Amino acid sequence: MRIGFVSIRHRSNTFARQHRSLILSPWPQNNQRHDLGTNIILPGVEFDGIELVPLVMPVHSAGGPIEPDSFSTLLTELVTILEQQDSLDGLILEVTGTLLVEEHSGELLLLRRLVERFPSLLVGILADQVAQLPEAVFGLTPLVLGPHHWPGIDRAQRLALLVRLLARWIRREIRPVAALERRTMLLPLAIQRTDCPPFDQLPPLLAAVEQNPSILAVTVFAGFPYADVAEAGMTVVVVTDAAAELGKTAARQLADLVWDSREQIAWPTLTIEEAIHQAMQNDSTGPHLILDTGDATEAGAPGEGTAALWAALDLGARQTLLSAIVDPQAIEIVLRHGIGTPIELELGGKTDHRHGYPIPVRGIVRRIGCGQYRRWSPLAGGELLDAGPSAWLEIEGRYEGHLDVVVSGRPVPFDELGLARALGIDVATKRIIILKSAVEALAWCRQSDPFTPLVRPAQVLQAVTPGIATPDLAFFSYRSVKRPAWPLDTY
């Protein structure tokens, strides 16, 4: 049995000021066993008599909604790629569940095109933890599931389950039926954590529910409050084997449980200045990891925010690393100066002042690189990223402080230290590490293997910073979200 695999993961932040385009590249035919990442099943490898066939190179990005012309081209190219396949028994789509084309669900548009062109092809969907899919998606395929953990460190295991369920569906051994239960809970990415209360109860609870032989898969999707759409909020999806009423009951009970736990959620409250000062005063061994939540590129923020940069310089932080500042103009200046030369320039804040203004800095160019590197986060270990031409700057701060800053030409997920290491920075020598991440950095900093203990943080501090990924939802003006919505409105 051959099942096609397509991964198009783009998180659309409707508060971003620039639309994005997506480019689809066919999977190299001579490289069927290319590694999609250490935490994902390897396409081209058979298991249980099933061959998972990669069709396109994975797309992994975040930013504004997708330009309609770009998405139309993507659909046409994907259909052409599928038409060129000799035989496929089924198809798996890996998506975020938040891709938007203008105000329309990209996943729904994609699924409709595939169903129209290939009506007999059964499709299963592996969605991100932030998914908020329209109900119409489930009318086209009921086989939709996602991770049990936030962040989704169990992605490979959930994909394995989906492959096996899709194979059983193809063989007509099961008849999947999906039940949905929504709650208009707007959960910022920073609080989507199953490593602490109250959501730490979810992984074991969902696993227990799936022990029922009539229940095929259960997922709690946290939602994505940075997409102002009618479907915004938390969704429980229960997929049963032709047991619709059982699914509805289970979905309602789980949704009520999540809703009833809302007042137990611990929201980030530290400012970036407070977080850095607290880390500077802490004498414990190991680095202190600070997350710049408002400018988290994993949520579609531009990564050019300067709140953390300003705070670290103003407080005179030492042995501190900031990764990263997206500033292609600064990169051009750095390239003209070269390695080892003194430099003065304005850094960050060039296009969107909601994340801060350019900061005049002075320092030394320590290293310049191409910006291509392999991720080492368990979310997608081994995935090749391209941050564009990048540099390591050592910048002078107050009180004889010095700050190492990674500057990149384009945004990528700054939830790990892969780019810093690629530039030659010895991250194990840093007392404070600041990442442009809301929550996904927790995927690696809570792991002890295979990552060296020298880079595991002694503590993690989530700082509330300005930007289109901030956990402070009062920052946003919603127009499409259904009201009342928690925590915006009183219940």
Where are these regions (language model features)?
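N-terminal amphipathic/basic leader segments beginning at the initiator methionine
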Residues: M1-D48
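Glycine-rich phosphate/diphosphate-binding loops that line cofactor/substrate pockets in enzymes
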Residues: M1-R2, P54, T80-L91, A275-H288
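Low-complexity, highly charged intrinsically disordered N-terminal segments
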Residues: P43, F47-L82
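Extended hydrophobic packing segments that form well-structured cores
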Residues: T76, W259, R374-Y491
